[in-house]
Swiss-Prot record:
GO terms for cellular component: cytosolic large ribosomal subunit. Forms part of the ribosomal stalk which helps the ribosome interact with GTP-bound translation factors. Is thus essential for accurate translation. The keyword Ribosomal protein applies. Coiled coil: none annotated. GO terms for biological process: translation. It comes from the Bacteria. InterPro entries: Ribosomal_bL12, Ribosomal_bL12_C, Ribosomal_bL12_C/ClpS-like, Ribosomal_bL12_oligo, Ribosomal_bL12_oligo_N_sf. GO terms for molecular function: mRNA binding; structural constituent of ribosome. This is Large ribosomal subunit protein bL12. Belongs to the bacterial ribosomal protein bL12 family. Homodimer. Part of the ribosomal stalk of the 50S ribosomal subunit. Forms a multimeric L10(L12)X complex, where L10 forms an elongated spine to which 2 to 4 L12 dimers bind in a sequential fashion. Binds GTP-bound translation factors. Pfam families: Ribosomal_L12, Ribosomal_L12_N.
C-alpha cells in the first residue's frame, strides 16, 4: 500500500474515526501524539544545559590601567565619561546586558586588552 493510498483513506475518515485511529496507533507503537511541552528550567540550575542566546558582560575589576578601562567602557557603552568612570569605580558591575555571544566576546576582548578583568555570564 502506497503513502498516497493511505492519505486518501485518511481523508475519507470522520473526526471520530481519526481519533480512534490515533489512539490505536499510540497503543500499538507505545507513542503519544501529544505535542512536546517546553518547560523553563530553574534559574541557574537545569537551564544551563540549554544553549544561552543572551549574555551579560560584567566588569570584575579595572586592574592597574583604570584610565584605559574607563575609555574602553565609554566607547563600548556610549556612556559619558563620568558615568563610565563611576561604573569602573564601582566594579564588579554589568557593563552590557542581554547581548549576543559574539558581541559579548568582542566586548570582553576589548576590556581585557585595556587591562580589565571581565566575566561573560
Amino acid at each position: 500500500m502506497s503513502n498516497e493510498k493511505i492519505i486518501e483513506m485518511i481523508k475519507e475518515m470522520s473526526v471520530l474515526e481519526l481519533n480512534d485511529l490515533v489512539k490505536a496507533i499510540e497503543e500499538e507503537f507505545g507513542v503519544t501524539a501529544a505535542a512536546p511541552v517546553a518547560v523553563a528550567g530553574a534559574a541557574g540550575g537545569e537551564g544551563a544545559a540549554a544553549e544561552k542566546t543572551e549574555f551579560d558582560v560584567e566588569l570584575v575589576s579595572a586592574g592597574s590601567s583604570k584610565i584605559k578601562v574607563v575609555k574602553a567602557v565609554k566607547e563600548a557603552t556610549g556612556l559619558g565619561l563620568k558615568d563610565a568612570k563611576d561604573l569602573v569605580d564601582n566594579a564588579p558591575k554589568v557593563v552590557k546586558e542581554a547581548v549576543s555571544k559574539d558581541e559579548a566576546e568582542e566586548l570582553k576582548a576589548k576590556l581585557e586588552e585595556a587591562g580589565a578583568t571581565v566575566e561573560v555570564k
